[in-house]
Amino acid sequence: MKLLIDVGNTSLKAKLWQNEQVQACDLNNLPWHAITHVIYACVGRSELLNAILAQAAFNSISCFEAKVTKTLGGLTCAYEHFNNLGIDRWLALIASFTLYPNKACIVVDAGTATTIDVLNCDGQHLGGWILPGLDLMTRSLTQNTQRVFDDENTPFTNQLGINTPNGLKNGALVATIGAINQAKPYLNDKNTQIIFAGGYGSLLQQQFKESIFDPMLVIKGLNYWYELDENSNKL
C-alpha cells in the first residue's frame, strides 16, 4: 500500500493506493503497518506534510518526492528548463499519458491557477499556458476596479451577463473556455481527449462534449510517476 500526498497552493490531499485503486484515508489514523511507501509532491509548503514524513521516518517507511525530468517512460517535457514546470502539471501529464495511451490530450487543472497543457499522441508535451483561476480572475477585478463587484451567490455560466456580478463571473468562465479552445489547433487531431482536474474542473468539463473530469488525476500521476521512475532506474 502506498500513501500518495499532493501539496497544492492552498491544501493538502492524501490518498492510499492499493490494488490499482485510489482509496480514502484519515490522516489522523493512517495504517502505518500496511504502508510501504510515501510518495509526495509539493507546490506549496506544508507543516502537515512535514509531520507525516516524520511519522513515516519513525516507522522506517521510504519516502519519495516526485520531480520533473526531461523525459520519463516515453513522455517528454516541452520546457527547455524542465525544472521550471510545476510538478502538479507534470503529474497530470503523466497520468493522462498513462491512462490514455497513444492519444492526443489537452490537460486542464483548474485550481488557484488554471493550467492548460497540450500533449500529442506520441507523448511529446508541446507546452501550455498558466491563467489565473476563476476565483483569482474575478477577485483581481473587484480589488483593482472601483465599480466592478461580485456576489457569492451568483454562479459561473457561459451566458451573457445582465448585471455586474454575472458579467464578471461569466466573463472569467468564457475567457477560460476560449483559452482551452485555443489549444485544439496545436494538435490537429479529431480524437483529442480533454481531461479536467482541480476544484473547478467539473464546472469546466460541462462546457466540453466528450471530455473527462478526473478529480484524482494528480494523485494517480503520483503513483504512475513512481512506477515509471522505478522502471527507468532498472534500465
From Swiss-Prot:
Domain of life: Bacteria
Catalysis performed (reactions): (R)-pantothenate + ATP = (R)-4'-phosphopantothenate + ADP + H(+)
Cofactor(s) demanded: NH4(+); K(+)
UniProt entry tagged with the keyword Metal-binding: yes
Enzyme nomenclature, EC number: 2.7.1.33
GO terms, biological process: coenzyme A biosynthetic process
GO terms under cellular component: cytoplasm
Residues the record marks as active site: 88 (proton acceptor)
Family: Belongs to the type III pantothenate kinase family.
Protein name: Type III pantothenate kinase
Protein species of origin: Pseudoalteromonas translucida (strain TAC 125)
Lineage, opening ranks: Bacteria, Pseudomonadati, Pseudomonadota, Gammaproteobacteria, Alteromonadales
